[in-house]
Amino acid sequence: MSAPLEHHTPMMAQYLALKGGYPETLLFYRMGDFYELFYADAEKAARLLNITLTQRGQSGGQTVVMAGVPFHALENYLTRLIKLGESVAIAEQVGEVGAAKGPLERKVVRVITPGTLTDTELLSDKAESLLLSLHQAARARCGLAWLSVTQGRVHLAECAHDELGAWLARVAPSEIIYSAGVTQRFEQQLQALRQSGAFDCPMRTRPDWQFDQALGERKLLEHLGAASLQAWDAQDLGAAQAAAAGLLAYAEHTQGRALTHVHSVQAQRGDELIDLPGSTRRNLELVKTLRGDDAPTLLSLLDNCMTGMGSRLLKTWLLEPHRERHQARQRLSASTALRGAAAGAGPWATLREQIKGASDVERITARIALRQVRPRELPGLVKTLQKAQLLAQHGQIPEPYLMQIFDQLHPPEGCAELLQAAIAEEPAALVREGGVIATGFDAELDELRALQTDCDGFLLDLETREKARTGIANLRVQFNKVHGFYIEVTSSNLERVPADYRRRQTLKNAERFITPELKAFEDKALSANERALVREKWLYEQILDRLQPHVPALTRLAQALATLDVLCTLAERSLTLNWCAPQFVSEPCIEIEGGRHPVVEARLAETASGSFIANHTRLNANTRMQLITGPNMGGKSTYMRQVALIVLLASIGSHVPASSCRLGPIDAIHTRIGAADDLANAQSTFMLEMTEAAHILHAATAHSLVLMDEIGRGTSTFDGLALASGIATHLHDKTRAFTLFATHYFELTDLPAKARHAINMHVSATESGADIVFLHEIQPGPASRSYGIQVAKLAGMPPPVLHHARRTLAALEERAGAGQLQVDLFAAPKEEPESKSASPVEAALAGINPDALSPREALDALYQLKRMAGK
């Protein structure tokens, strides 16, 4: 508000002072049983939450606009706001009533943002809440740092500006922060990336001074307890360290304390992971279907994990496969050992049964470190620690990776015992409600509780004595939270009330009194209750203090338990779905016998729609490209996707849906499959297709797998054919990537005659009268025809349309048979003339750095170039 604080009422002055620290955040201000919002916050909340907007009184010469929500329904409203990308600051009453003049003391106790969630009610069991920080560095470089507050690991990376979109799509943050000092061009790039779909989350600016490289390095070293970042291969990531400074400052700001549970840093290099662009993740339906649903996807098929932390880890494995095979071999060896020699013979089933029901140790540990853990989470943690101790006894399984995991499952000494002794078996939801600390843990608390327990006996005894003394048979001695203890007498018996009865409350048909004896007991009992609650709160804080040294060990245990959960799940899935172990080799190849599409096969089994037709794939040094032709609905896209999914599954260390699989080095999986117009960004299907194809041609290498499906649609036949042939030739001759190239242009089947590493394949179909039967088999050679009219018939096309189409097709085929000059689509293009040495203008232009010029310098440079060009 514009008026100075001294012109406002004391309460509104307090509110505005708090709000000043959180100008871009909705402030929930606790008032009794409600959280109130005022002024612009109230108007925004009323609109977003559909709650009532009211006006009440004036402050600072203006009407106070307000809206509120009940305190007991807070989590519901927070969930809705977070899903809308909003952030919320919670201001609680921290002072005692009557302790000071003026309004009750309040302070902001936590800030809830989409990227820093820790509350169980706000988090999805199977998804992380990720905060990502960006730092614009020199030479068109960018530093990235991100973390999940509940996980406690900081990730660092650096990239060129033109690679930022790919990194944001890979990380998929829930919230992005960046320095307020970035250039306008960088900010425009971020907005363009969000519009393009590279990410979809709120962005916020933070003070420029927080993004300091030296500060970031110091903070990271403090968290690691180390003198150098060299052991984490992060010593040379200065831009990422600057991003980490902003990241940790913001995360600490939202949690209201240091992140003491952050003990791990992971530096990620662009060449460490198999590249899975956003189009690949989308087209292969890894975690979302093309319609945006969670199932059926590859993740939904794989995820039979028993814990939420296992599900989250499996998703990370799936989206971050490593190029180097050591990790995949490790996981594959472990899951194979868990499988045993045959179904039911391995230890996976026993282990999964023991893991079942385990608490989310990862998130509980983070909340312990942040002192936000709820009492009801702790008994579950005790049971999980006991489960972990039993699981650790399986360490005799003779498999190196599993032995490491079991070794980390031993609970920290004394942790479970402390919690078992200190926390009630069924504690209250909140400490302030009492009943959290177990009986017998603290003698003083037990004594205070005994006073409360004796209350019922005293009241019954007093009621008996007062009935005898007054002769009032229906006299009652009772208690409520508003009026305390009282003796209730009906109106018809008021003449019998003794002189020492003092009136406390008048009702319609009765009066309530208190006596000196009852008043003395009330003071003692209520005091005991208040003191017991204070004692419980103090004891709970002491317990959290004693748990802090166990946080690192609990974090390691959580990671081990999640890893074991995923490995057992992969073992179970491989047995249930009849998958085989892939073989990793050094020579370049993708050789699959009896490959199946895992999701399609599972859907067929669920719906009893028949069995999946397996197919072989052989790509190696001699055959790097398959040109696939055949009718629509024949299975071309399914075949191509299944090859990519098998490669991906093998790369994460899973068994694969095939009879056998040999896989060489892979650095990326690129896909160009299907499209729809991007109306929001004014891009047609054809433009999207060409954009994605261009990206693939620039990014793919000889170790990449490329899927190209029906490239060239959306323009004229000749244009599409020419482009398709050019793209296929480039992939074969220049890129030399492993390529599955499905096409409806039969002219492209001439390519293998001139390209030594390409072969024709087709999806088989057969005619039965006027109908078509799809065999879904991939066979050598080109397709003989496309069966488009038969497919149209299956789709329900009206008979007159089909009749017209058949006559037109016959005429076109007859005309084509008359013979015309055949254009050689695959003739080597004429060499482009060698580029001449750069002209003076070009040399001068190449030496200009537009980002380093002031507007005046840019104008001077332009005139200089103009003069040079005119000579």
Swiss-Prot record:
GO molecular function, one term: damaged DNA binding
Protein name as it appears in the record: DNA mismatch repair protein MutS
Region (Disordered): 830-849
Native source organism of the sequence: Verminephrobacter eiseniae (strain EF01-2)
GO BP: any one term: mismatch repair
SMART domains: MUTSac, MUTSd
Family the entry assigns: Belongs to the DNA mismatch repair MutS family.
Protein keywords: ATP-binding, DNA damage, DNA repair, DNA-binding, Nucleotide-binding
GO cellular component terms listed in the entry, alphabetical order: cytosol
Transmembrane found in the keyword field: no
Lineage: Bacteria, Pseudomonadati, Pseudomonadota, Betaproteobacteria, Burkholderiales
A Pfam short name: MutS_II
UniProt KW Kinase keyword: no
